[in-house]
Every structure is written in C-alpha cells, then in structure tokens.
Amino acid sequence: MAKIRDPRFKLSRRLGVNIYGHPKAMKRATRENSREGKKLSNYGKQLLEKQKIRSYYGVLEKQFLRYVKKAMKSKERTGDVLLRSLECRLDNIAYRIGFANSIRQARQMVNHGHILVNGSKVNIPSYEVKTGDVITLREKYRKNDEFADNFLALKKFSLPYIEKDYDKFSGVLIKEPERDEIPIDANETLVVELYSK
C-alpha cells in the first residue's frame, strides 16, 4: 500500500503549518525552511492548500482526486463537502475520538483490526463513518496502556459532532461536521479552484 513518507516535522515546516499537532513540529522552523513570509503565485497558493489538506489526512493524490470529484458532484458547497468527507474517514474519526495520538497511528490501528464499527471489525482506513455509527476500541486492546492513556487524556477536548463514552471506550458520530467545527487550518476554496480549471 502506498504511503506518504515525508518526515512529519520537516513537512509541517515546509507547509508552514503544524499539520500533525505535535508541539515540537515547528520549533526548528526558519524563514529558509518555512513558507512563512514567502510570496506565492495564485497557483502556488492553491497547490500549498492542497498539500496541507492531503498531508493532514494522509491521502495520496489519486485518492484525494476521488474525494474532490465526489464533492464537485454535490449540490452543496464543494469545499465543505470535501472536508466533511475527509473528516468522516474511519482513521480520522478514530483519531478524533482519542484512540490514537496521530492520524498515522489511528490508520495503523484500523489496518490491524483494533477498531470496531457498530460492533464489527472494519480494517479500511478510508471507510466512511456515517451519523449514528458507534466506533469502539476492541476490548482486548483497552488494556494497552498507550491506547487507554490516549483516550482518557482527551477528556477535556471535545468536538460537537462526536460524543464519547469513556466507560465503553467508544465514540459516536452524532451529526455531520460543519466546516467551522473541523479543526484544520486550510483554505479549501483554493483547492476547489485548483481542480476546477
């Protein structure tokens, strides 16, 4: 399976935004290795925003293009549909619930069958989580200190579209996320413009 292999901190500095949420990701950023302060053409800005979103969700170009085409067919605002579709990927929802400390780790957990959807094992990271779906950490992995610590450490962090049950090690997508609720720093409108040419 193809993967994005760029070093995470280096990629964050190159894009000029902490796409992985790690506190040390931007510490060594300088004007030479960061986008900050650099003038970009309109195309360059569009490309940069695409790279941010792709890198954040960890999807390759071919896969990303499928999400864009699907969003363009919708009658709703294309950028909103694009981000909503990416946000509702199983690996991302598992990360948002708190089973992992990164999307990469969440993807690995899904691949290895650690995550259940409505009680059934799903090992496809791109699986689209729907409203009402219950996402659970398999019982035998709840004793894993790393997974348990990740989950319990995020009690103070909550999103309006996810409801957590700390006793059952589960989370439910209670509604489709709105754009202003999705915690990602990117301009999806520029991405839509890029693919609309």
Swiss-Prot record:
Q: Keyword rRNA-binding, does the record have it?
A: yes
List GO BP terms, alphabetically. Answer: ribosomal small subunit biogenesis; translation
Keywords, ordered alphabetically: Ribonucleoprotein, Ribosomal protein, RNA-binding, rRNA-binding
Covalent S-S links between cysteines: none
Quaternary assembly: Part of the 30S ribosomal subunit. Contacts protein S5. The interaction surface between S4 and S5 is involved in control of translational fidelity.
Do you know which HAMAP family this protein is assigned to? Answer: Ribosomal_uS4_B
What task does this protein carry out? One of the primary rRNA binding proteins, it binds directly to 16S rRNA where it nucleates assembly of the body of the 30S subunit.
User: Into which family does the record put it?
Assistant: Belongs to the universal ribosomal protein uS4 family.
Q: What is this protein called?
A: Small ribosomal subunit protein uS4B
Q: Give the species this sequence originates from.
A: Clostridium botulinum (strain Hall / ATCC 3502 / NCTC 13319 / Type A)
Lineage, top ranks = Bacteria, Bacillati, Bacillota, Clostridia, Eubacteriales
Q: Name the gene.
A: rpsD2
